[in-house]
Amino acid sequence: MLETPSKVAVAPDGNGGLYAATRSPLSPGKSDTVLSDLAKRKVLYVHAYCVDNCLVRVADPVFLGYSIQKQADCAAKVVPKTQPTESVGVVAVRGNKYSVVEYSEISKEQAERRDSETGGLAFRAGNIANHFYTTTYLNRVESFEEDLAFHIARKKIPHVDLETGNSVKPSKPNGMKLEMFVFDVFPYTERFAVLEVERNEEFSPLKNAPGTGSDDPESSRRDLLAQHKRFLEIAGAQVRDKVEIEISPLVSYAGEGLESVKGKVYTKSGLVEAAEELDALV
């Protein structure tokens, strides 16, 4: 397919292209790569996450510590699925190896299967693209990267009509893109770890346009503000109805360091970028 009469239509190779990117030069004419720079700075562990999640805990010490304690070379955070039919891949063991099984690959019967001991879903570990790696493992990816399979994504691809030369913006999928996924490396790990976290504290994806009703800018904003309200209330404060307070992670990363709010009642909305600014919202 042609993007213009003189240009072939191309597309990114998916978030699985991350691994090859770590071996690419940091800038034109330079030999340094992400991996060589990490080695130069003696970095042993890396946290990677999907950028569309406003509740992500960057370099979460709990996740990093858990993964290191487990001596994992790769690890993933997961959240419990909300329902059997939720459109999310699950971390599972397939062929004696850890992998992410896409929701489209699971039958209705498998999706609804219950754990005989807990009564919960058997396949409940929803993948949220939140991963831990050792730099040793990242360096090893190149040795098996050619074995990773491409995934087919059917997309609406703008193109040029070869007969008229006019640009066409299709209303339905008209082509296939070949993509790699960041979790495709899971089956190649020697020690894999999984940490289940609370969805309302660590996962609010932004995937849809404004006004969609779920996983959109409004739901991301709602979930972030609700979390920060919980931070204040757990610390002993009261927050009046309809008051919206956003707390910079420079003030509190996960609700810690807010002892000064105990007993206070917040009546004004605002963005808090320094602890002393909280007093102005009482």
Language model regions located:
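Terminal amphipathic alpha-helical/low-complexity segments used for targeting or macromolecular assembly
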Residues: 110-121, 125-282
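Domain-scale recognition of functional cores that engage charged ligands
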Residues: 1-183, 281
